[in-house]
UniProtKB/Swiss-Prot annotation:
Gene Ontology BP annotations: coenzyme A biosynthetic process
Recorded GO MF terms: GTP binding; kinase activity
Function text: Catalyzes the GTP-dependent phosphorylation of the 3'-hydroxyl group of dephosphocoenzyme A to form coenzyme A (CoA).
Chain residues that bind GTP: 45-47, 64, 120
Domain of life: Archaea
Iron-sulfur in keyword set: no
Enzyme class: transferase
InterPro entries according to UniProt: GTP-dep_dephospho-CoA_kin
Keywords: Coenzyme A biosynthesis, GTP-binding, Kinase, Nucleotide-binding, Transferase
EC number of the protein: 2.7.1.237
Protein name as it appears in the record: GTP-dependent dephospho-CoA kinase
Length: 177
């Protein structure tokens, strides 16, 4: 299996399962940060922008230069720290290289920005599954705000249920477990 191969793919009949937020939704980054516990892992450009703007650089940020399929505004792009590495991941998938980069970034003591050539939307799944206990994963909910996912047994169990709706490979589970 190559690094660019899909470790997980979202089948069309499972898309609805991923539309509802998996945690509380915030429109104010300061309020979200008051409820968050480190390390903070951000999935999405606009989420990362709001956290940085509120004074909190995420331990890990996964970005793709897009929001809701459009390029992010220059102010958003310019506020996000330069990527430490770039990986490819096609829309509707999570590539082996993206999962590996995410797992490695979570283990790294330094803040890491992972840029995705393609789409990072599904990166929230391996982020929650691979994050340490009591971490916080934050992702964007289109039209609503930022979702805070506390990495607890319950949060992981709910994300594992969603992961079970994906078409996954053995490599996916090896990397996130």
């Amino acid at each position: 299996m190559s690094e660019t191969d899909a470790a997980a793919t979202l089948p069309a009949d499972a898309r609805d399962a991923f539309k509802s937020p998996i945690g509380p939704v915030y429109t104010d980054a300061a309020a979200l940060l008051a409820d968050a516990t480190p390390p903070i892992i951000a999935v999405g450009d606009v989420v990362t922008y709001h956290l940085v703007d509120a004074g909190q650089t995420p331990a890990v940020a996964v970005v793709d230069g897009r929001t809701e399929r459009d390029a992010v505004r220059p102010a958003v792009r310019d506020a996000i720290p330069e990527p430490d590495l770039t990986v490819a991941s096609e829309p509707g998938t999570v590539s082996v290289s993206l999962v590996r980069a995410l797992v490695d970034a979570i283990a790294d003591a330094d803040a890491t920005v992972v840029s995705v050539d393609g789409e990072e939307d599904l990166a929230v799944v391996p982020a929650v599954l691979a994050a340490p206990a009591d971490a916080t994963v934050v992702y964007g909910q289109p039209g609503e705000g930022m979702v805070r996912v506390p990495v607890t047994d319950a949060g992981r169990a709910e994300m594992r249920e969603r992961a079970d709706r994906l078409e996954t490979t053995a490599a996916f589970w090896r990397l996130v477990d």
